[in-house]
Design a protein with these regions (language model features):
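Auxiliary tRNA-acceptor-end handling modules of aminoacyl-tRNA synthetases
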Residues: 1-13, 25, 34-37, 46-308, ...
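Metal-assisted phosphate- and nucleotidyl-transfer catalytic regions
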Residues: 74-116, 252, 352-421, 425
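A translation/RNA-centric and nucleic-acid-associated enzymatic feature enriched
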Residues: 267-269, 278-287, 296, 300, ...
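Extended, charged alpha-beta segments that form solvent-exposed binding/catalytic grooves
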Residues: 304-386
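Glycine- and Gly-Pro-enriched alpha-helical subdomains that act as flexible
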Residues: 472-473, 478-481, 485-493
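Conserved small/polar residues in nucleotide/adenosyl-binding loops
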Residues: 503-510
Length: 513
């Protein structure tokens, strides 16, 4: 059943208003500040500023004190609309604001928000009506980091002032306590302590698995293989690098090239695959198919590479090279619902093994997409109907689908209450059409199959990172790299301890130390 996506509009509006309060405080404390942008985000807000000196942690209290002074004055937030030319005059001397204004149509009016009478900023709103409404909110500056103007490394490096903001001071304290606990569980910290993986300066974002990490990884893979064998999947493996022409046909070249690693071989451009699906399509296309073979479920533990900015990398949770537990299902239109139900059941079974709760989102057509309106409507309806028949609650996530089709996303909840998007089911009418895939139907005629893309772990590497933090390194016994440690209390017990370890435990394939 579709449920309304819960968004706390009041909190979002307050965070946005607090960003303006921060900007006003910074201008009062550091008049040479040039303001750029300052949006609300999931746990608070930030403001990017151009300031000659670097703000240090010693200055946080001073800035917060100034913010509280402004709030306690109870100044109103008021909107004013001005012409483009007037806005350019108001922000003369601030090249960041004037750049934004100059991108607007010449006849477009510009929205400003005033905080009191002496501070204004470019903004569409909305905001609280008065700063008084922010008096009970808990907020705290937690960091100042570098950020390129508009995220472009060719532009000037700015300072991004991050703040947490919550409805009450208790909510703020609870959030900070959760983050402190999360630091103790950080996959980078525990990965090193437990000798699971390492990241080398010679390969940022490319994880090295150590012996203990390989045990966890291989156990997850073994479980995946057995589960999929029982569910009627066949495993394939496709090349890691393929010709540019393939990516042009698939649409990745137009929609995903900026995330791809390229190379030239024999004067031809090749790309290291960022996704496994075109390879799976080529496997299907390599021979004729009858309707009697469908659905054809092809699984692949494929290594993919995607470019991520260095500042966004984080242990196993954000990497540039990872293994996706992919599967591509080729089917007839009449099989859509049953196949989606089967995949949902498989995903549910896996998450229950790890005692992980989840919620479901149905992500719809993004702006940067390919295919006809009719195909997108059919695909979206197919996913929605399957979820409704399963009586699953789900949230509509507008505009967050893949460029080739809508998708069902599964968001895991960990022991700290954080959520992680892992599993996904994508229904695709586009790739079968672009690659001219066919099967011979019961009527003896050629028909176009429909394709499902799906993952359960998402990326095995990221899933391991989530498990490390969820279990704080104390994996379930079946997954633990070290299941038993034999200790000898005195020297005279050494021989017996070795007998227990090497004879009894090894005979039962127990992982011991």
């Amino acid at each position: 059943m579709e449920i309304k996506k819960e968004k706390d509009e009041e909190l979002s509006k307050a965070r946005h208003s607090l960003a303006h309060i921060l900007a006003k405080a910074l201008m009062q404390l550091y008049p040479e500040t040039k303001l750029t942008i300052g949006p609300a985000i999931d746990d608070g807000f930030y403001y990017d500023i151009d300031l000659p000196h670097s703000i240090t942690a010693d200055e946080y209290d001073k800035i917060e004190k100034k913010m509280k002074e402004i709030i306690n004055k109870g100044e109103p937030f008021t909107r004013k609309v001005v012409s483009r030319d007037e806005a350019l005059k108001l922000f003369a001397g601030n090249e960041y604001k004037t750049e934004i204004i100059n991108e607007l149509p010449k006849d477009e009016e510009v929205s400003l928000y005033y905080t009191g009478d002496d501070f204004y900023d470019l903004c569409r709103g909305p905001h609280v009506d008065s700063a008084k409404r922010l008096q009970n909110y808990g907020f705290k500056i937690h960091s100042v980091n570098g950020a390129y103007w508009r995220g472009d490394e060719k532009n000037k490096m700015l300072q991004r002032v991050y703040c947490y903001a919550f409805k009450t001071k208790k909510d703020l304290a609870d959030h900070i306590a959760m983050l402190e606990e999360a630091k103790k569980r950080d996959n980078r910290k525990l990965g090193k302590e437990l000798k699971l993986f390492m990241i080398s300066p010679e390969g940022p974002g490319f994880p090295f698995y150590l012996p203990n990490g390989m045990i966890v990884r291989n156990l997850l893979i073994d479980y995946w293989r057995e589960l999929h064998r029982q569910a009627g999947y066949k495993e394939i493996m496709t090349p890691i690098m393929l010709n540019r022409h393939l990516w042009e046909v698939s649409g990745h070249w137009d929609h995903y090239k900026e995330n791809m690693y390229l190379s030239v071989i024999d004067d031809e451009t090749y790309a290291i695959k960022p996704m496994n699906c075109p390879g799976g399509v080529l496997v299907y296309k390599s021979e004729p198919h009858s309707y009697k073979e469908l659905p054809l479920r092809l699984g692949e533990l494929g290594i993919v590479h995607r470019y991520e900015k260095s500042g966004e990398l984080g242990g196993l949770l954000r990497v540039r090279s990872f293994t996706q537990d992919d599967a591509h299902i080729f089917m007839m239109p009449s099989q859509i619902k049953d196949e989606i139900k089967g995949v949902v059941a498989l995903i549910d079974k896996v998450y229950k093994v790890f005692n992980l709760d989840y919620f479901v989102e149905l992500s719809t057509r993004p702006e940067n997409s390919m295919g006809s309106d009719e195909d997108w409507e059919l695909a979206t309806k197919g996913l929605k109907d399957a979820l409704d028949e399963l009586n699953l609650d789900y949230i509509i996530n507008e505009g967050d689908g893949a460029f080739y089709g809508p998708k069902i996303d599964f968001h895991l909840k960990d022991s700290l209450g954080r959520t992680w998007q892992c599993g996904t089911i994508q229904l695709d009418f586009q790739l079968p059409q672009r690659f001219e895939l066919e099967y011979v139907g019961e009527d003896g005629q050629k028909h176009r199959p429909i394709m499902i893309h799906r993952v359960i772990y998402g990326a095995i590497d990221r899933f391991i990172g989530i498990l490390i933090e969820n279990f704080a390194g104390a994996f379930p016994l079946w997954l633990a790299p070290e299941q038993v440690r034999v200790l000898s209390l005195t020297e005279r017990n050494n021989d017996y301890a070795e007998t227990v370890s090497y004879t009894h435990l090894r005979a039962h394939e127990t992982r011991r130390h």
